[in-house]
């Protein structure tokens, strides 16, 4: 199966530590013999910190996006290092390049691509480009909620939801660089257009990637 996996930066680099990179590398390496794997890595707190400084310096939102993209690519390089020879050694900067290097049979790891595209959007566009069978979005919560469960204990969890319903919930949310929450609008439009089977899963435990593949946890997004 061809799978695109997006790992939020808040998951993989919540602290400047090698441990999460190593743990995800071990899980991904255990899957590579059975699946074609593409991984998109987010920027996390380092990206937000750099973007915050850039805004204080008067940078435009487009420039802030560029800075965030640079950080995601650094995170991608760290994961590639953890994966060793099983990963393609370079970080593709666009979707065509990602598709081309997939011919090597190695795990393809990339960061951002262009301004105004979150990690979710990059993952969804990549999934369409490589004709993925599944996209798994690894985030800091158990799946999709109607509002932030960290702020609202009574937030409703959805084990299953359509992309159209998610768009209704997310209408009006913040789309500035470094502020994406829950799931990105562009990603949802891509999922709906391309019929990409998608799961949203808590990535704080790397083992949850295996549980998601077994259908045990997370939110399934129906592409309609």
UniProtKB/Swiss-Prot annotation:
InterPro entries: AceGlu_kinase-like_sf, Asp/Glu/Uridylate_kinase, Uridylate_kinase, Uridylate_kinase_arch/spir. Keywords: ATP-binding, Cytoplasm, Kinase, Nucleotide-binding, Pyrimidine biosynthesis, Transferase. Signal peptide: none annotated. Belongs to the UMP kinase family. PANTHER family: URIDYLATE KINASE, URIDYLATE KINASE PUMPKIN, CHLOROPLASTIC. Catalyzes the reversible phosphorylation of UMP to UDP. This is Uridylate kinase. It comes from Methanothermobacter thermautotrophicus (strain ATCC 29096 / DSM 1053 / JCM 10044 / NBRC 100330 / Delta H) (Methanobacterium thermoautotrophicum). The gene is pyrH.
